[in-house]
């Protein structure tokens, strides 16, 4: 928390010196934390108001509650505390006078102002330069920032004297001595001129002499320029300019001061005309010279290079029964003709004959990705008489499968009958260029080639729709850089990309280019910049941003360069918060929301400068072995995100490339980790400084297809980083039925809303609703109920009477399903926001109310939770919709319950659909036409490589450490989780002793903690579930408890009765035993077993960024990650049956459904039986039905196979067997030697051992 003691304020309200109780730019939440730490009645501070510019907020602590009073300036710059009607207003000239009066008792405040609370300052070294680690050792002189750049705002007045202090010394040393001469004139000759004017003089001789003296150097410079231009002019025209010649001849003649000034003005006028004339002369001369030459070629109008036909070698995946009929599995060649819109299936027969079938693009109905087998893909073809057929193919690799899917999507898009696209591809590049010009060839950056997750060679040349290039320490001029980018793209794609925006701040630049066909789809372009150096004004660090609308979808792009230095993590965090708050992008009507909530899709990238907290030799050893997992555990950015300090609920693709900084220039083989400085040797450990993160609205479509770095661009000590994204977009919807009439109006109706807000205040609140589908924002009435079980948190509730009915401007479901609602919870006393959130309308559409549940945040900090019940009523005649192109690819739901390689957990209810590695959970959707018939079925938790057709997601963090504890148990029941909405055990404020709960008794049953983490303090609140989670199995269930055992509420908070409108399976159906620990409330809780994952190299013990799910935080009692863990299971139990846990295996027709919009994961994994796949493929149903019989799913057989392989010491082959379809012991008995070889078993002894063991088990 940073607070400055500068002195903004109207009319010098703070006097000549800012007092200790004044905190500039301090947030409301941070102010309450400072007062809570003070802990004494009468503690107070003054901060800037968040709702009214130029106003202040007086915060007073009394009886452990914070009371806030607004201090408003009037038209005469007097200050007064806002009072109730009828109370006389007292006016003050300064804040000091105001505080002095209210420090006396009985002045109308809740208590007298007794104890001023000072801010916490981060100690800075005397020379506070960002180049502390040698990163910017010789930065070029920064150019002037453009007119669109903005700096941190300062108040209209300053406590310091006039503007002469910081600039005078520099000005005195200016080469022309202008400031010195001017200063001398004002001190001496000014008086003489004044006397002369009083005496009737009509001119100012001393001022004239002063100006002439100051401009003498300008005289000589103009003479030099004129002389050079005259020579250049003679190249194109033999005649000289007589005026120029005369002026040059007079340059050595003696002149008086007045004559000198007249001569200078004349020279400047001649120079202006001469510059214009010489251009015309040159143009005419060159036109005459080329009149006999052949005409210049016309600009190229070629379209993008055509995509050649691509072939993929695959094997047909068949059942065991079919395999016995046809013998060895069949091999196919799939040829994709994007330009022709055809897919050809070529099957090679044993007698060398070929059999092929051609499907046009409109006969390919759906692609179904297997979640469990990464290189398996189901393709649904349309046959005659409206029948379909599904074929499952096994590709050579998962990358080939993704390339095939991308080509088919491109083919569908190219031949679509839709006028506007449903999906576009976006390239994001970030590169710290090290103040060195780039090499001639940067194609590998443009085409995402290099290390990490890269595109397949068949798709690298496909041009993206939008290219965004962010650079730092870029010494190339803006125009030159833009031309370089456009030229590179032109050479690569044969397309003339259009520049949409270019924004610079010093040497930080962001450039956005789009395909020519999309130029008219771009609107509302906005640019901005923020300085984050010393006092947010000096230095060379900061951020630049660009935002625009692509049809109906808003995009934001932020390129930043944060403070360098291993030890400056807190400063980097503050840089991020400053950028988040001060960058002015997007819709101005959404100024109540920070930029993380203003855009459908926000991409944040750049040189974030977060480092690795590990010894340099250990880092180098891990890099040499290409073991990045231990390094990612000590990555500062990951650690800070897991503590909710920065990038709240942003996503980042899994990192599989080496650290991009700090390389020896000219090579990518050596890290230059030591730097000789005057103060000694400076160590710059290799780090992932250059990153790409993103945040999207819930229930939107976004997939990260690549994330890596180049390995052949070596001019800088940073490697360029790239990321490519598949992004769903919406069109500017035009209703075929026209604007909504009263008879067919759509309505957004709320039954209730309930929020938990992190505050020590007890004021009333109201909600504001914003959306592009509304004509204007709407407000609710103040809440009609509130309660508090904890001093630092307040639960507020609104019934339907207090909530408005919203009327969208259009009533069509196709329009409404793409809309979102932004909510901000504001206080009645100061009209300041206590938290904002976004809710997708798609899941709320229906004839019955649906539940929504999400987090509140403010100024980048998590400040609460909000849940409610609402419905979007759409007239029946406006229910028509169509399938989006990105919904054409789905996840095989039959396999969704199987384990994935690295599952992760989400933290909210409504999330963007993303196929990235880090977003965490899949949810199968039902068609919108079915929304009025039945609620959606929730899928089990997982981490798919690609999204389902409608998978709401929130921003999870990456699990990096398998939790330690007891071996995986089964079959023991645990108590159901309690409702955290009324459980004070969840509410812990950072640095403040818990005042309502007894201290936690020691728990001897806690899982052992690694030695490297013994210096950490246990947390007794829910942790944000960062570990791997075992997926539920039919008939088995899964644990509902969090990884940290001390997270369950005490037993005196029973769950409420089950609402009739929201019935679904409880989060824990068949809980499993685990180590018993006690939470703060004293309730016993059984921790879940460690999850299962594919074998990976063993990791040495060490501090883990995921330590929060182990129930630990860093030393120093840093509980910031649990400032708001208050409702990790916010509403799970409110809708859980009160009776005993039921069996996880239910007959299909009786499966219970959750309300749409509730999370599949809210701090812990939910367990549901894997839903049956719903397809129109009749011939496949009979084949798939046995898989769900007998109370087992595919994951169960896989687990048995895993145990069997471990028993015989051959677990290394598990992944190869699973990827080739041998995932169940029941079918392994039919495996052959050839099948084992294809699965990677080459050792004859191992093959014999496997076959013999299987034979004995028959």
Curated annotation (Swiss-Prot):
Span of the annotated motif SH3-binding: 944-949
Intervals of motif NPXY motif: 983-986
Example GO biological process: establishment of mitotic spindle orientation
Record-linked PROSITE patterns: SAM_DOMAIN, SH2
Protein name: Phosphatidylinositol 3,4,5-trisphosphate 5-phosphatase 2
PANTHER family the record matches: PHOSPHATIDYLINOSITOL 3,4,5-TRISPHOSPHATE 5-PHOSPHATASE 2 (PTHR46051:SF2), SH2 DOMAIN-CONTAINING PROTEIN (PTHR46051)
Residues covered by the SH2 domain: 21-117
Quaternary context: Interacts with tyrosine phosphorylated form of SHC1. Interacts with EGFR. Upon stimulation by the EGF signaling pathway, it forms a complex with SHC1 and EGFR. Interacts with cytoskeletal protein SORBS3/vinexin, promoting its localization to the periphery of cells. Forms a complex with filamin (FLNA or FLNB), actin, GPIb (GP1BA or GP1BB) that regulates cortical and submembraneous actin. Interacts with c-Met/MET, when c-Met/MET is phosphorylated on 'Tyr-1356'. Interacts with p130Cas/BCAR1. Interacts with CENTD3/ARAP3 via its SAM domain. Interacts with c-Cbl/CBL and CAP/SORBS1.
Protein species of origin: Homo sapiens
Catalysis performed (reactions): a 1,2-diacyl-sn-glycero-3-phospho-(1D-myo-inositol-3,4,5-trisphosphate) + H2O = a 1,2-diacyl-sn-glycero-3-phospho-(1D-myo-inositol-3,4-bisphosphate) + phosphate; 1,2-dioctanoyl-sn-glycero-3-phospho-(1D-myo-inositol-3,4,5-trisphosphate) + H2O = 1,2-dioctanoyl-sn-glycero-3-phospho-(1D-myo-inositol-3,4-bisphosphate) + phosphate; 1,2-dihexadecanoyl-sn-glycero-3-phospho-(1D-myo-inositol-3,4,5-trisphosphate) + H2O = 1,2-dihexadecanoyl-sn-glycero-3-phospho-(1D-myo-inositol-3,4-bisphosphate) + phosphate
Location (main, coarse): cytoplasm
Ranges of Polar residues composition bias in the record: 145-155
Swiss-Prot/TrEMBL keywords: Actin-binding, Cell adhesion, Cell membrane, Cell projection, Cytoplasm, Cytoskeleton, Diabetes mellitus, Disease variant, Hydrolase, Immunity, Lipid metabolism, Membrane, Nucleus, Phosphoprotein, SH2 domain, SH3-binding
Entry's family note: Belongs to the inositol 1,4,5-trisphosphate 5-phosphatase family.
Residues that bear Phosphotyrosine: 886, 986, 1135, 1162
Name of the encoding gene: INPPL1
Every SAM domain range: 1196-1258
Protein localization: Cytoplasm, Cytosol; Cytoplasm, Cytoskeleton; Membrane; Cell projection, Filopodium
InterPro entries: Endo/exonu/phosph_ase_sf, IPPc, SAM, SAM/pointed_sf, SH2, SH2_dom_sf
Gene Ontology MF: a single term: actin binding
Membrane topology designation: Peripheral membrane protein
Feature: compositional bias, Basic and acidic residues: 119-132, 951-965
């Amino acid at each position: 928390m940073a607070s400055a003691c500068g002195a903004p304020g109207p009319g010098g309200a703070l006097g000549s010196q800012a007092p200790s109780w004044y905190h500039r730019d301090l947030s409301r939440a941070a102010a309450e934390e400072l007062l809570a730490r003070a802990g004494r009645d009468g503690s107070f501070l003054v901060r800037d108001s968040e709702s009214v510019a130029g106003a202040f907020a007086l915060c007073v602590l009394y009886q452990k509650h914070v009371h806030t009073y607004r201090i408003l300036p009037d038209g005469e710059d007097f200050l007064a505390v806002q009072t109730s009607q009828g109370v006389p207003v007292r006016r003050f000239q300064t804040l000091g006078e105001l505080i002095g009066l209210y420090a006396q008792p009985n002045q109308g405040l809740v208590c007298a102002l007794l104890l001023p609370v000072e801010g916490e300052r981060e100690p800075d070294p005397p020379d506070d330069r960002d180049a502390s680690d040698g990163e910017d050792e010789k930065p070029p002189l920064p150019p002037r920032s453009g007119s669109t750049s903005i700096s941190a705002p300062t108040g209209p007045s300053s406590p310091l004297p006039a503007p002469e202090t910081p600039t005078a010394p520099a000005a005195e040393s200016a080469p022309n001595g202008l400031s010195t001469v001017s200063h001398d004139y004002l001190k001496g000759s000014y008086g003489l001129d004044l006397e002369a004017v009083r005496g009737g003089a009509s001119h100012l001789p001393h001022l004239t002499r002063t100006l002439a003296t100051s401009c003498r150097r300008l005289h000589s410079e103009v003479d030099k320029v004129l002389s050079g231009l005259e020579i250049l002019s003679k190249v194109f025209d033999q005649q000289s300019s007589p005026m120029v010649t005369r002026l040059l001849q007079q340059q050595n003649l003696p002149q008086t001061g007045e004559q000198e000034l007249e001569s200078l003005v004349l020279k400047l006028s001649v120079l202006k005309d001469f510059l214009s004339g010489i251009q015309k002369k040159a143009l005419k001369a060159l036109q005459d010279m080329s009149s006999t030459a052949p005409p210049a070629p016309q600009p190229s109008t070629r379209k993008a290079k055509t995509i050649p036909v691509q072939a993929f070698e695959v094997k047909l995946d068949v059942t065991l029964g079919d395999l016995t009929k046809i013998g060895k599995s069949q091999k196919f060649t799939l040829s994709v003709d994007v330009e022709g819109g055809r897919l050809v299936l070529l099957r090679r027969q044993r007698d060398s004959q070929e059999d092929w079938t051609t499907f046009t693009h409109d006969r390919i109905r759906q692609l179904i990705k297997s979640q469990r087998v990464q290189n398996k893909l189901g393709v649904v073809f349309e046959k005659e008489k409206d029948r379909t057929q599904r074929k499952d193919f096994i590709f050579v690799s998962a990358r080939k499968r993704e390339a095939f899917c991308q080509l088919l999507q491109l083919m569908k898009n190219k031949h679509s009958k839709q006028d506007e696209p449903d999906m576009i591809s976006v390239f994001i590049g970030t590169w710290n260029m090290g103040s060195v010009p780039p090499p001639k060839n940067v194609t590998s950056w443009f085409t995402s080639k290099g290390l990490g997750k890269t595109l397949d060679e068949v798709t690298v040349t496909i041009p993206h729709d939008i290219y965004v290039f962010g650079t730092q320490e870029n010494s190339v001029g803006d125009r030159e850089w833009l031309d370089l980018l456009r030229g590179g793209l032109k050479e690569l794609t044969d397309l003339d990309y259009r520049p949409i925006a270019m924004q610079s701040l010093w040497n930080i630049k962001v450039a956005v280019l789009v395909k020519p066909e999309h130029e008219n789809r771009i609107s509302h372009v906005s640019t901005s910049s923020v300085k984050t150096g010393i006092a947010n004004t000096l230095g060379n660090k900061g951020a630049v941003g660009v935002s625009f609308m692509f049809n109906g979808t808003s995009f934001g792009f932020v390129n930043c360069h944060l403070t360098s230095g291993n030890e400056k993590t807190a400063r980097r965090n503050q840089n991020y918060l400053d950028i988040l708050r001060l960058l002015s992008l997007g819709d101005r009507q959404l100024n109540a929301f920070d930029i993380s909530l203003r855009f459908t899709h926000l991409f944040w990238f750049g040189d974030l400068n977060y480092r690795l907290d590990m010894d340099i030799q250990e880092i180098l050893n891990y890099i040499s072995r290409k073991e990045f997992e231990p390094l990612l555990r000590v990555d500062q950015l990951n650690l800070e995100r897991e503590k909710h300090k920065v990038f709240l609920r942003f996503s980042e693709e899994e990192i599989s490339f080496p650290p991009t900084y700090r390389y020896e220039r000219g090579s990518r083989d050596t890290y230059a980790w030591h730097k000789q400085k005057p103060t000694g040797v400076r160590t710059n450990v290799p780090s992932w400084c250059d990153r790409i993160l993103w945040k999207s609205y819930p229930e939107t479509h976004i997939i990260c297809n690549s994330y890596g770095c180049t390995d052949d661009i070596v001019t800088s000590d940073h490697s360029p980083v790239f990321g490519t994204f598949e992004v769903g977009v919406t069109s500017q919807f035009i209703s075929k039925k026209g604007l909504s009439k009263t008879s067919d109006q759509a309505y957004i109706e709320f039954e209730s809303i309930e929020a938990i807000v992190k505050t020590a205040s007890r004021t009333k609140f109201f909600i504001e609703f914003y959306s592009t589908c509304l004509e204007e924002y709407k407000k609710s009435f103040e809440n009609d109920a509130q309660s508090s079980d904890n001093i630092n948190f307040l639960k507020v509730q609104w019934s339907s009477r207090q909530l408005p009915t919203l009327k969208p401007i259009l009533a069509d479901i196709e329009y409404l399903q793409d809309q979102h609602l932004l909510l901000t919870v504001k206080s009645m006393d100061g009209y300041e926001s206590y938290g904002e959130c976004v809710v997708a309308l798609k899941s709320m559409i229906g004839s019955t109310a649906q539940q929504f549940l999400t987090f509140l945040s403010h100024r980048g900090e998590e400040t609460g939770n909000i849940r409610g019940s609402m419905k979007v009523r759409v007239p029946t005649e406006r229910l028509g919709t169509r399938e989006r192109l990105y919904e054409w690819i789905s996840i095989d739901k039959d396999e969704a319950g199987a384990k994935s390689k690295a599952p992760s957990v989400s933290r909210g209810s409504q999330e963007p659909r993303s196929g990235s590695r880090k977003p965490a959970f899949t949810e199968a959707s039902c068609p919108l036409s079915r929304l009025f018939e039945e609620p959606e079925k929730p899928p089990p938790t997982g981490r798919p490589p690609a999204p389902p057709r409608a998978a709401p997601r929130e921003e999870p963090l990456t699990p990096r450490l398998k939790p330690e504890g007891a071996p995986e148990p089964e079959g023991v029941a645990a108590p159901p989780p309690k409702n955290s909405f009324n459980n004070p055990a969840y509410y812990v404020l950072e640095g403040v002793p818990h005042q309502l709960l007894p201290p936690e008794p020691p728990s001897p049953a806690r899982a052992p903690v690694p030695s490297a983490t013994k210096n950490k303090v246990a947390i007794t609140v829910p942790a944000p579930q960062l570990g791997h989670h075992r997926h539920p199995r039919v008939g088995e269930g899964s644990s509902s408890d969090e990884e940290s055992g001390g997270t369950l509420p005490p037993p005196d908070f029973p769950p409420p009765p089950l609402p009739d409108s929201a019935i679904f399976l409880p989060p824990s159906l068949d809980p499993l035993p685990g180590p018993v620990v006690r939470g703060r409330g004293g309730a016993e809780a059984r921790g879940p077993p460690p999850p299962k994952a594919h074998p990976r190299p063993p990791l040495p013990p060490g501090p883990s960024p995921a330590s929060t799910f182990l129930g630990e935080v860093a030393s120093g009692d840093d509980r910031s990650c649990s400032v708001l863990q208050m409702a990790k299971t916010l509403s799970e139990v409110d809708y859980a049956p009160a009776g005993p846990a039921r069996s996880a295996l239910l007959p299909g027709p009786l499966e219970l459904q959750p309300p749409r919009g509730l999370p599949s994961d809210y701090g812990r994994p939910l367990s549901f039986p894997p839903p049956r796949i719903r397809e129109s493929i009749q011939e496949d149903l009979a084949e798939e039905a046995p898989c769900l019989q007998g109370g087992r799913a595919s994951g169960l057989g896989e687990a048995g196979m895993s145990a069997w392989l471990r028993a015989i010491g051959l677990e290394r082959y598990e992944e190869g067997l699973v990827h080739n379809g041998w995932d169940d012991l029941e079918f392994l008995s039919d495996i052959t030697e050839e099948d084992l070889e294809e699965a990677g078993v080459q050792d004859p002894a191992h093959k014999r051992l496997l076959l013999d063991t299987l034979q004995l088990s028959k």
